[in-house]
Amino acid sequence: MSNTSNFNERVTENAKPPKNVKSIIWKTIGIIIVMAIIIGLILFYVLPRNTIANISNIQYVDGNLVATATINGRSGRFILDLENSTYQTSYTSGLSLSISVFLRNLNNANGQSFFVSLIRPATSSANDAVFNIANLSINQTRGVATLVTEGGSYSAVLTTTLTALPLTGQKFLPEGFNLDTANTDAYRAAGAIPGIQRLLAVGNVQLPNQSTAILTQFLTSIIPFVILIVIYIVIARRFSRTMGAGGAIGEDGENVFTIGKSQAKLAKSTFKFTDVAGIEEEKSELIELVDYLKRPGKYVQMGARTPRGVVLYGPPGTGKTLLAKAVAGEAGVPFFQVTGSAFEDMLVGVGAKRVRNLFAKAKKAAPCIIFIDEIDSVGSKRGKYEISAGSATDQTLNQLLAEMDGFSTRTGIIVMAATNRLDVLDDALLRPGRFDRHIQVNLPDIKEREAILKIHSRNKNISSKVNLLDIARRTPGFSGAQLENVLNEATLLAVRADRTSISLTDIDEAIDRVIAGPAKKSRVISDFEKNQVAHHEAGHALVGLHLKGADEVQKITIIPRGQAGGYTLSTPKDAELNLKKKSDLLNMIAGALGGRASEELFFGKDAISTGASNDFYKATNIAKTMVTQLGMSDLGITQFLPSEGGINPNARYYSENTAQRIDEAIAKILEEQYQVAYNIIKDNQNELKLIVEALLIQETIVKNDIDYIHEHLKLPEAIIKLKEEQLKEKAAAEKEEQAEKAKLDHQSDSAQPQEEPTASTASSN
C-alpha cells in the first residue's frame, strides 16, 4: 500500500552491468601480447648469452694451434685453442663459426678463394672431426686440418715437425708457422708446400659461457611452461567472469568459484515514513526498531532485548517492501535486500553457504537490516510434502534458523521479511527470538486509499473536478500498487489525447483498465451477442439491487475488456471489514449466478452462453469454503480442509462418504442461491429490461443512472435524450443511404444503351 512516485530513482544499488564477451576476449589477447613482449625483453637482458669473438690471427703457441680473437662482448680478448677439447662438451651446441679462407696453390699461380662456414657442431668421438667447417675439417686427435676443394684434397699436419703423409696433394704447415710473419715465397722456393698459406679469420665465433650454461638451459626450458601457466590462469579467470556476467553460469558475475557467495544487494535507502501513506498502526510498530538502530545503548542499559526479526505479511502490493525501506531510510543504516529464491541453486548446500555469507557481511556492516522478500520460498514448513526431511531447502532453512538465533551471537542486525502467506512459514522461524513481531499489512480502507492517491498525485496535473475521495470510494479492494497504476494509466491516457491535465474520464477508463484490461471497442459484436451480454450484466446488477445487505452496484458496462464481454462493479455499503457474515457470502453467490439466471429466463436453456464461466468459479469457491472450512452448512462445524498452509493433493482428509456429503452440500448452496437470483429477475423483468435498454443506448451506466432506474422504473432524462439523438442519426443515415442507392440506380439506368427500332417497326409506323 505504501508507495512513492520515484521508487526506482531513489534507491542506488551496487549492481554491475554485464560485460561484453567480445571486449573481454580482445582485452585478454592484448594483455597476453603485452606480457609476451615484456617477458621477451627481460629474457634478452637477463639471460646469459654466448660471447661474440672476431678472429684476427691463427698461429702456433707453445706447440698448440690457437686463434687470437677480438671480443665484442663482455670478456675482452680471448684465446681460442683449436687443438684442445675445451669446447668439446655438451654445451657447445650453440657454437657457430664462419671463416673466410684464401688458398694459394703453387700449381695454381692465380690462386683460388673459398668461403666456408659451420655446418654442424663438434662431436666427442675420437675418430670424428672436432670442427667441420664446410669442406674444412680439423681433427684434434690426429692433428690434421684437411680442406677438400675442386682442385683436390689439401691437408696440413698440426704437429711440431714436418711430417710427410702418403696422401697425394698433401700440404704441410710447419711448427712455428705464423700467419702474420710467414715468408710464403721462401716456403715455395724450399719446396715446402704449405697447404694453407693464408687462413684469414674471419668471421664471428660465438663462445659459450660454460659457467652459466646450466642456468641458461634451465631457464630456457622452464620459462615457456611458466608463460603457458600464466596465460591459462588469465584466460580462465577472464572466461569465468565473462560467463558469470553473461548468465551462462550465474547472474551478477557469479561462477563456479563464487557460487556460494550471497546474492544480497546492498542498497542505501532514502525513504522516510512520510513517503508511506496509510498503515499508521503498522508504522508505529516499526518506530521502535528505528529507535533501536539509532540508539542501541538505551536498550542495553535497561536490559531489554530488541526484536531480532519482523515479518510483514499481507496481500500483494500493500507496501511491505516499502515499509522495510522506510525503516532503513529512517535509521540511516545499510540495507541488505535479497529474495528467498536467491539462496537456492543447482548445487546442494549452496543455500546454507549463502546464508552464512549473508550474515557474515551483515556483521561487518552492523548495525544494519537484512530484508528477505518472499521468504516463504525458503522458510516454508519443513517436511511438508517430501518423503525425506533432508532436502536442500530444509538445509537452507536450518542454517537461517541457526544464524537468527543460535550459539553465535549477533548484535545490531535486524532481519525483516515479507510474505503473502504467513500460514506456510515454519513454526520455528516464527517463534520469539527469531521473528518476534508479526505485522499484518492489509488492503487500504477508503481513508488510506485517499491518502495513497494524494501521495501519487503530487507530481501529476489533475483537474480540479476530480475528487480523490470519490476515486477512493470506487476502488474498494485496491492495493497501493493498483492505485498507483490507476493514476499512471490516467496520466498516459491524458498524454495520448494531448491534454495538459488528467480528467475524470481518464481516471474512469484507468480504473476499468486495472480491473478488466483495456477496452476492445474494435471487436465486432453482433446485435444478438450485444443484447445477450447486456441481459447477463443486468442480471448481476438486478440481483445486487434487490438483495438486502448486498454490495452497491457502482457501474455496469458491456464494452469488451480482456476476455470479458462486460462487467458489473459493486462495492461494500458499510465499513470495509474482512469479517463476512453467512448472509454476505450467500448474497455474493446469488449475485454471481444472476447473469446465468437472466440468460436462461430471457433466451431459454438452449441459448445460454459461456459468459458465466468465471461466475461459476467464484460461486463454487465461496460455497466450498463455507462447507469445508467455515462450518456454514448442514454438515456442522467440522473443518474438512485446513484453512492455513498448503493442501497436499495426495492427502486424504476425509472418507469417500464424507466427500460425497460435501459435494451435496456445495451443490445445495449453489442451487438455492441460483433459484434466489432467478426469482428476483423473474419478479423484476421490467426493471431489468430498462437496464438492458440503457446499456444498449449508452454501453456504460454508472451508479446515478442505476439508482434512478431502480427507484423510478424509467430511464433517466439524459439517456432518453441520447436515445432520441441516436434515432435521429439513424433515420438520417438511412435516408442518406436510400438517396445514395437511388442515385446509383439512376446512373446505372442512364448508362445502358437504347435499342434502335427494327425495320418492321418502322414500316408499321
Curated annotation (Swiss-Prot):
Parts of the chain on the Cytoplasmic side: 1-27, 235-765
Residue stretches of biased makeup (Polar residues):
749-765
Which cofactors is this protein said to need?
Zn(2+)
Q: Which residues cross the membrane?
A: 28-48, 214-234
What does the sequence similarity comment in the record state about its family? In the central section; belongs to the AAA ATPase family. In the C-terminal section; belongs to the peptidase M41 family.
List the ranges whose topology is Extracellular: 49-213
Top-level class of the enzyme under EC nomenclature: hydrolase
What does the note accompanying the cofactor annotation read?
A: Binds 1 zinc ion per subunit.
> What positions does UniProt annotate as the active site of this protein?
E537
The question of whether ATP-binding is a record keyword is answered with yes
Q: Which GO terms describe its cellular component?
A: plasma membrane
Keyword tags: ATP-binding, Cell membrane, Hydrolase, Membrane, Metal-binding, Metalloprotease, Nucleotide-binding, Protease, Transmembrane, Transmembrane helix, Zinc
The protein's name: ATP-dependent zinc metalloprotease FtsH
Q: Which PANTHER family match?
A: ATP-DEPENDENT ZINC METALLOPROTEASE YME1L1, METALLOPROTEASE M41 FTSH
Q: Does the keyword Cell membrane apply?
A: yes
